[in-house]
A protein has these predicted regions:
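Extracytoplasmic beta-sandwich strand-turn segments characteristic of Greek-key/jelly-roll folds
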Residues: 85-109, 140-151
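A structural detector for beta-sheet-dominated domains
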Residues: 51-53, 65, 107, 134
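Extracellular Ig-like/FN3 beta-sandwich strand-entry sites
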Residues: 67-69, 109-111
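Histidine- and aromatic-enriched segments that form or immediately flank copper-ligand environments
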Residues: 46-50, 58-60, 64, 73-98, ...
Length: 152
């Protein structure tokens, strides 16, 4: 009945609905391993790409600037995950086959916890990542436009 209602009433996952093949998302395109993490575009826009997979976020640490709009994009190849970033308004579900997208601006510096809040199996309690919010003056992308926690 739920599936019938979803199909006939055009019910979709929350957030900007963008479809992606969960079986191949890691092979090419924006969610390939070399494209994960924080990037700064030619226009100065900051985009973070993260894969939520049992039982970890990849990458485990992301660096973002304080006081600038950030676009966070999430995908998963396996099961439904949920995440939030403590002390912010970021709270979303990550559903296989869809890209979850959230826009936010981080208003304080420091390390924030990003746990999975949707039970995803036995290792669920160990599924978390760190968001490092750094002052704008310390947020320096490399020549490739990428910023990582390791650079700090």
């Amino acid at each position: 009945m739920i599936v019938f209602t979803a199909l006939t009433r055009d019910i979709n996952p929350p957030s900007n609905v963008e479809r992606i093949d969960p079986k191949t998302l890691h092979l090419s395109g924006e969610f390939a391993e070399q494209n994960l993490g924080t990037t700064v575009g030619a226009d100065g826009g900051v985009t973070v790409r993260v894969i939520a997979t049992q039982f970890m976020f990849v990458p485990r640490c992301i660096a973002v600037p304080h006081g600038r709009r950030v676009t966070l994009r999430f995908a998963t190849p396996d099961v439904i995950h949920g995440l939030l970033i403590t002390g912010t308004n970021v709270n979303t579900m990550v559903v296989p086959g869809f890209v979850a997208q959230v826009h936010t601006e981080f208003t304080r510096t420091g390390d924030l916890l990003m746990p999975c809040h949707e039970y995803c199996g036995l290792g669920h309690s160990e599924m978390w990542a760190t968001v490092q919010v750094v002052p704008e003056s310390e947020f320096k992308p490399g020549q490739d436009g990428r910023v990582s926690c390791a650079q700090r």
